[in-house]
Amino acid sequence: MIKLFVTDLDGCISHPFKTPEWNNIEKIRSLNIESRKSDIIPPLTICTGRPYPYAEAVAQWLDVRLPFVFESAGLYHWNGNRVETALNNIQDDLEPIFSMKEWIRSHILPEFPTANIEFSKMMDAGIVAPEKEVIDAIIPFVQEKIKTDFPLLEMHTTDISVNILMPGNNKLQGMKLLAESQNVSLSEIAYIGDTGGDVPALKEVKMPFSPSNATRAVKDVSENLDAETSSAVLMAYKKVIEFNRSL
C-alpha cells in the first residue's frame, strides 16, 4: 500500500518561470482533499530543492496538510511552525555553504547579470537564471570551485538552477525525514521527480515516476510517463490510486 504521494515542484507541478496548468492543479488538489476520506488515495506532499517560501505557497495551492520538504532536506511542520533538519549544528555545519554563497556573490553574479542567488535559502547555495545557456556556462565554474576548495559538497543542477548542498543533505535525506514524521517506510511512498537531484530519492521509494520532460538519468530509475509536468503528476497520482485499489 502506498501511503504517501510526493511530488517535486519545478519540472513536475509546472515548468519553471511559466504559469501552471491550473486545471491539472485543481484535479491534483481535489484528489489530495479526497484522500482524507479514502483508504486507497494517499495524501499528497512535496519534496523540492526550492526554498521554503515557494514550497509553502505551492503547498497552499494543493491544500497540503502534511509536512513538506524544501531545499532537499529541510522538513517544514505546519504543526508548531517548525523546521526539522538532519544537521547537528546549522551554523557550524553549514560553514562551507556560507563560503560558497559569498563566492557566488563576488565571482559568479558579476559575470552573469541575469543570474541571482536564491537569497531565502537556509541550507544550500542556490543560483537561478531563466536561461539554460547561462546555467550551462556557470556549471563549470562551480564544479572547479567545489573540486578545489570543498570536494565533499554535492552539486545538483536543473535547466534553471545550480544547487550546492552539504554531503548527504539531499532529497533522500529529506524523504527519510518525511517518512519518519509520518511513521511510514520508503517502501510505502511514491515520488515523481525530473532532474538529477531527484535520483537519490527515486532509487529508494516504492513507486518512482518521472514526466516526459525528465532528464535521462531520472528516466533510467523511474517509470517515465507520456505526459509533461502537472499532467504527469496527475497521471502518476491516478496510477498510485489504481495500485492501492488492486491490493
Model-derived features: positions:
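Mg2+-dependent phosphoryl-transfer enzymes with acidic/Ser/Thr/Gly-rich catalytic loops
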Residues: 1-2, 21, 164-165, 172-247
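A general structural motif
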Residues: 1-2, 41, 65, 122, ...
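Asp-based phosphoryl-transfer active-site loop
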Residues: 2-18, 202
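Active-site flanking residues adjacent to catalytic metal/cofactor-binding acidic residues
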Residues: 7, 70, 193-194
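Short amphipathic alpha-helical segments
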Residues: 18-19, 57-60, 81-82, 139, ...
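Active-site phosphate-binding/coordination module
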Residues: 26-114
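Short, surface-exposed amphipathic charged segments that create phosphate/polyanion-binding patches used
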Residues: 80-88, 170-171, 240-244
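Conserved acidic, metal-coordinating active-site core of Asp-based
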Residues: 103-204, 213
